[in-house]
A protein has these predicted regions:
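HIT superfamily nucleotide-processing domains
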Residues: 1-180
């Protein structure tokens, strides 16, 4: 495998933004997002289905169908509309999902008669291009190789933690999932 660089940028809300690239990323950051309160995702027992389901009240505050020019996953070059990535360019970016149904707070949420338990896990978003319309199918092989190396680095780091049993990568894309990358 070829060499990659990983920049660790600590955001104003203490979440880490990782920038991967073939060249070292040294760009100064632009405007950051406002700090949001951490949500308290948890599992709730569904007695009619006889299974645990995830619940995250914080998801109701997530960005929902903004115009493409205000995509929260694109480079944050517009100071009037900060994004998750406060840089004007990058190769691959990785950051924690602010609206995840899982987190590592390990607290049980008491909501009366509803059975709950912690929804332990870690959810990251990997943005594999600073171009809104890019897809993996259209990426050159060296960019795909960088993406695979990024996945490998994330696997290695996450699986070294005692609270992570497995890692499941998947791609969310499209209007049906309330995502703006179509």
């Amino acid at each position: 495998m070829s060499k990659f660089h990983k920049r660790i940028f600590e955001r104003n809300d203490n979440r880490k933004l990782l920038i991967y690239g073939r060249a070292e990323h040294t760009e100064k950051h632009t405007q950051e997002l406002d700090i949001t309160l951490p949500s308290s995702p948890h599992l709730r027992w569904n007695p009619s289905r006889q299974e645990w389901v995830t619940y995250s009240s914080g998801r109701e505050n997530r960005t929902f169908f903004p115009p493409k020019k205000y995509c929260p996953f694109c480079p944050g070059s517009d100071l009037n509309f900060p994004t998750e990535i406060p840089f004007s360019s990058f190769e691959v970016a990785v950051f924690p999902n602010r609206w995840s149904s899982f987190n590592t707070h390990n607290k049980n949420i008491d909501i009366g008669s509803i059975k709950t338990k912690p929804s332990n896990g870690h959810s990251e978003i990997i943005v594999y291009s600073d171009v809104h319309e890019d897809t993996i199918a259209e990426m050159p092989l060296d960019r795909i190789q960088l993406l695979v190396e990024t996945w490998n680095d994330r696997y290695t780091e996450l699986l070294s933690r005692d609270d992570i049993a497995y890692v499941l990568p998947f791609e969310n894309r499209g209007e049906e999932l309330s995502l703006i990358h179509i």
